[in-house]
Amino acid sequence: MGSLVQGDDFQHILRLLNTNVDGKNKIMYAMTAIRGIGRRFSNLVCKKAEVDLRKAAGECSADELERMMGIVANPRAYKIPDWFLNRQKDHKTGRFSQLTSSQLDTVMRDDLERLKKIRGHRGLRHYWGLRVRGQHTKTTGRAGKTVGVAKKK
């Protein structure tokens, strides 16, 4: 149960996975500040770690935070299903994993480079700076391109 008076051990800002997390928010919503962790995954992690969802992030003990970060680091060991993870069947390793913060950025960049290197349709669209997912581009998405006709004086 959340208390009205903050204890002496309350942390206003927590450092989790190289991200500053607001200690005043409830733990489930505070964890969503970390890239790669959404509300559903955060909720599941809190339940697996047996942490009270109504508790503020700054009120969590070091043991509770350690348990949650352990689950985020290795979710398959805690019986989180493969379809719930954000990296499924990795191209290099074939493994399923949950990527967070800097790992996510690195893997996304590598994926785009791989698509460009194999010269597939998606890779070429990324290379040219065009829409990738089949959207029409005749009239929309013109920002940042060449300027139109200049008016005569």
UniProtKB/Swiss-Prot annotation:
Sorted alphabetically, which keywords does the UniProt record give?
A: Cytoplasm, Ribonucleoprotein, Ribosomal protein, RNA-binding, rRNA-binding
A GO cellular component annotation here is:
ribonucleoprotein complex
A GO biological process of this protein is: translation
Gene3D superfamilies from the UniProt entry: 1.10.8.50, 30s ribosomal protein s13, domain 2
Q: Where in or outside the cell is it found?
A: Cytoplasm
The record ties this protein, via InterPro entries, to:
Rbsml_uS13_C, Ribosomal_uS13, Ribosomal_uS13-like_H2TH, Ribosomal_uS13_CS
Q: Which domain of life is it from?
A: Eukaryota
What GO molecular function terms would the record report? Answer: rRNA binding; structural constituent of ribosome
**Range of residues in the leader sequence:** none
Q: What is this protein's function per UniProt?
A: Located at the top of the head of the 40S subunit, it contacts several helices of the 18S rRNA.
The entry assigns this protein to a family as follows:
Belongs to the universal ribosomal protein uS13 family.
HAMAP family attached to this UniProt entry: Ribosomal_uS13
Know the name of this protein? Small ribosomal subunit protein uS13
Q: Which organism is it from?
A: Chlamydomonas reinhardtii (Chlamydomonas smithii)
